[in-house]
A protein has these predicted regions:
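Mature, function-bearing regions of proteins
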Residues: 1-254
Length: 254
């Protein structure tokens, strides 16, 4: 039995200041149980693992981004933070490659123990400069709604200052997914961002349906980012220069 799944839904962003800006796009994501990748490669006709296909997943798109095992990467970082890795299961919510291309602004690793309790969450954030930052949170209480907060440590948008705080609210994946991020500065809320989706099985039939609905989704994501940035610039929102160059940073937040 395959536990990995497809979630079809929407991404929403609303900026509150200095000017209101709103957009919404239809997307689909995969929630991949990392231990199933080889099985998915064999059983799902349109999906490949670390090789080209209509839809594919590559280890080098996440973690250390050097093609090494993501399970090993998660285990390594959990051990550094004294989080148990005994009999854990790891699921990753992300966009897949479509026709060999992907850009994931946010990927979420969900780590479960042998009792199916959520014990850690890793938020992996990327920007369009090829950089990545991962925020690691220990889950102290496994509720259906998980809430985390931290200061912003990574340059994402050139239209938002670094002196901000993130507030994450996520539902444990089930029939639906929900990932919500509120961003605040000292004067109040700047940005609301969310991804919502409804679950279907990850198999050849539903993957083909998802592709037909979104044949150029991953290309559209990167184009949409630049298009929305252009609209912010036209609205006169200040462009903030980026000074520090990083590759893969990781911070522990609790």
């Amino acid at each position: 039995m395959i536990n990995s799944s497809i979630y079809s839904g929407q991404v929403v962003h609303k900026r509150f200041k200095p000017k209101i800006h709103y957009f919404k796009y239809n997307v689909f994501s995969l929630l991949i149980e990392l231990s199933e990748l080889n099985q998915l490669d064999k059983k799902v006709n349109l999906f490949s693992y670390n090789r080209f296909n209509l839809v594919s997943f590559y280890d080098k798109d996440h973690g250390d981004r050097d093609g090494t095992s993501l399970i090993d990467w998660v285990n390594k970082n959990l051990k550094k933070n004294k989080i148990s890795t005994e009999n854990i299961r790891i699921k990753l919510l992300c966009y897949p490659r479509i026709l060999g291309f992907v850009f994931n602004p946010l990927s979420v690793f969900y780590v479960y123990d042998q009792s199916e309790q959520l014990i850690a969450i890793l938020y992996e954030v990327k920007n369009t400069f090829g950089e990545q930052h991962t925020y690691i949170f220990r889950v102290e209480k496994d509720n259906s709604l998980i809430q985390n907060s931290c200061s912003k440590k990574f340059h994402v948008s050139p239209f938002i200052e670094m002196k901000c705080n993130y507030f994450f609210r996520i539902l444990k994946p089930g029939n639906k997914i929900s990932v919500i991020i509120d961003q605040y500065d000292s004067e109040g809320k700047i940005l609301f961002a969310s991804q919502e989706g409804v679950r279907t099985d990850l198999n050849s039939k539903y993957l083909l349906k998802s592709y037909i609905k979104h044949p150029i989704m991953t290309f559209k994501i990167i184009l949409a980012i630049h298009y929305e940035a252009f609209k912010l610039w036209v609205k006169g929102i200040k462009f903030i220069k980026k000074n520090i160059k990083i590759k893969n940073n990781i911070t522990t937040e609790n």
